[in-house]
């Protein structure tokens, strides 16, 4: 008997690389989206850390009045921020090689644009990587769909809003106080608190927090005990076990008696779909609201006060909001313009004399 042994052709380097990239056996899945995600997020993170510590002041308003945002220029963790790219640059693509020098690039806030564009590309690739891993494992794609909500929100404030307003200088600063400043100015200019999509977003975030806390507390309160009273209930479970770890019927019964019968779910799939959909849809609407207000389709305004038969103003909460908005608008960019737009367009009263 003759045995014929064929020599197996060695796999090419590219083939081994492809297999390694797409292998689900790796401790951390990389995937083709990860090939782009890793360098973009590393770049964004590295530049953010360096700029937050040591970036020189940035001429954000384009009026030769630089604003410092880094720790070495007098800020702390709360007040520090990556200052947005200068209004003098507008929406122009502004990589380092477009500036005459690195000093000019830093003065005009080049790091902000670099960080934001790499970050948005990176988180979009992270979302794609979630879908890719789900696909390879034979899972459904809803993890990536859920993650699309924060991706949409980040894209709205860092990219869509600057595009609508005509300059990256209107983007959200990358810092704690900078975020609050962005929110205050956004309210002043767009009355976001009176926009229905923002209201849906608030309901989504707060409602999602409430439902998450309710679900977690119900589950942990209705665990099926597999141990004695002298042992931890956690010892009775194995990671990935097929058996249920908690009694959904007991949880359903408790909650149904606490509120009313139909306020609780007796189907696990329906319950978890609801827990996912509520905050995701809310944040989608918030991102959509930011994206429409970017082009000045603003929240409801009540600029026409309620008056009585004699023409006297009857003060309402809307008047308080309008006054607050004007005050906030006056205070921001105070050196770039003397009056808020709402006051600047009003015809000045004539004077005799």
From Swiss-Prot:
Reactions mediated catalytically: 2 a plastoquinone + 4 hnu + 2 H2O = 2 a plastoquinol + O2
Residues annotated to bind chlorophyll a ChlzD1: 118
Cell compartment(s), UniProt: Plastid, Chloroplast thylakoid membrane
Site feature (Stabilizes free radical intermediate) residues: 190
Annotated positions of the Phosphothreonine modification: 2
Modified sites of kind N-acetylthreonine: 2
Gene Ontology annotations for the cellular component aspect, listed alphabetically: chloroplast thylakoid membrane; photosystem II
Top enzyme category: oxidoreductase
Site residues (Tyrosine radical intermediate), renumbered to this chain: 161
Its EC number(s): 1.10.3.9
InterPro entries to which the protein is assigned, alphabetical: D1/D2, Photo_II_D1/D2_sf, Photo_RC_L/M, Photo_RC_L/M_CS, PSII_D1
Note in the entry: 2 of the reaction center chlorophylls (ChlD1 and ChlD2) are entirely coordinated by water.
Protein name: Photosystem II protein D1
Species: Aethionema cordifolium
Name of the coding gene: psbA
């Amino acid at each position: 008997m003759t045995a014929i042994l064929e020599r197996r052709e060695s796999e090419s380097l590219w083939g081994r690389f492809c297999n390694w990239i797409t292998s689900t056996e790796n401790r951390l899945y990389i995937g083709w989206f990860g090939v782009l995600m890793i360098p973009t997020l590393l770049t964004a993170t590295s530049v953010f850390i360096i700029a937050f510590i040591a970036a020189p002041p940035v001429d954000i308003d384009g009026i030769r009045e630089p604003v410092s945002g880094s720790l070495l220029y007098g800020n702390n963790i709360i007040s520090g921020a990556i200052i947005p790219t200068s209004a003098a640059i507008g929406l122009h693509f502004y990589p380092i090689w477009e500036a005459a020098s690195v000093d000019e690039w830093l003065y005009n806030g080049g790091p902000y644009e670099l960080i934001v564009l790499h970050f948005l590309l990176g988180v979009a690739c992270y979302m794609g990587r979630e879908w890719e891993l789900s696909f390879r494992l034979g899972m459904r794609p809803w993890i990536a769909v859920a993650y699309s909500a924060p991706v949409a929100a980040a894209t709205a404030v860092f990219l869509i809003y600057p595009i609508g307003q005509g300059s990256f200088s209107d983007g959200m600063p990358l810092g704690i106080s900078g975020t609050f400043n962005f929110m205050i100015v956004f309210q002043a200019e767009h009355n976001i608190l009176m926009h229905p999509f923002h209201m849906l977003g608030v309901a989504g975030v707060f409602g999602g927090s409430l439902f998450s806390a309710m679900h977690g507390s119900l589950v942990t309160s209705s665990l099926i005990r597999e141990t004695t009273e002298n042992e931890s209930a956690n010892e009775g479970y194995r990671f990935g076990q097929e058996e249920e770890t908690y009694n959904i019927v007991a949880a359903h019964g408790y909650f149904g008696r606490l509120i009313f019968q139909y306020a609780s779910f007796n189907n696990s799939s329906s319950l978890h779909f609801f827990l996912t959909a509520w905050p995701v849809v809310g944040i989608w609407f918030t991102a959509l609201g930011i994206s429409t207000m970017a082009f000045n389709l603003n929240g409801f305004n009540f600029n026409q006060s309620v008056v009585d038969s004699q023409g006297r103003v009857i003060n309402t909460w809307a008047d308080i909001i309008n006054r607050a908005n004007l005050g906030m608008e006056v205070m921001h960019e105070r050196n770039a313009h003397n009056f808020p737009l709402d006051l600047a367009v009003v015809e000045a009263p004539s004077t005799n004399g």
